[in-house]
């Protein structure tokens, strides 16, 4: 099991898929990393040599922001939006969808479980 950027890659998967377990690296980025490092995409993680691992680490450190650094940058960007007081920051603060999606129905993932509102009872005559 190879450990790259603080993440244990699953040893039975191909390296092109294994690299996507790192936050900030998708399939295309993974393919580009392997191309720069000169490693075949079909190699399994368990078959990687130490030189291959070192080459992958070097390419990732030079060219990509991954894991903790990327997470903290994303959180700082969201915090900046909230501090500035813009519309997107307001939506983040309220826990609502940010990119213009409808909220009359749906948006359950962002809003959370329904909060039932009690009806006022009508006065009887």
Swiss-Prot record:
Signal peptide limits: none
The keyword tRNA-binding belongs to this UniProt entry's keyword annotation: yes
Chain segments annotated as coiled-coil in the UniProt record: none
GO BP annotations listed: translation
Gene Ontology CC: cytosol; small ribosomal subunit
Pfam families: Ribosomal_S13
GO molecular function: rRNA binding; structural constituent of ribosome; tRNA binding
Region (Disordered): 95-125
Bias-annotated ranges (Basic residues): 105-125
Keywords: Ribonucleoprotein, Ribosomal protein, RNA-binding, rRNA-binding, tRNA-binding
Role description: Located at the top of the head of the 30S subunit, it contacts several helices of the 16S rRNA. In the 70S ribosome it contacts the 23S rRNA (bridge B1a) and protein L5 of the 50S subunit (bridge B1b), connecting the 2 subunits; these bridges are implicated in subunit movement. Contacts the tRNAs in the A and P-sites.
SUBUNIT field: Part of the 30S ribosomal subunit. Forms a loose heterodimer with protein S19. Forms two bridges to the 50S subunit in the 70S ribosome.
Family: Belongs to the universal ribosomal protein uS13 family.
Protein name stated in the entry: Small ribosomal subunit protein uS13
Gene source species: Leptospira biflexa serovar Patoc (strain Patoc 1 / ATCC 23582 / Paris)
Gene that this polypeptide is encoded by: rpsM
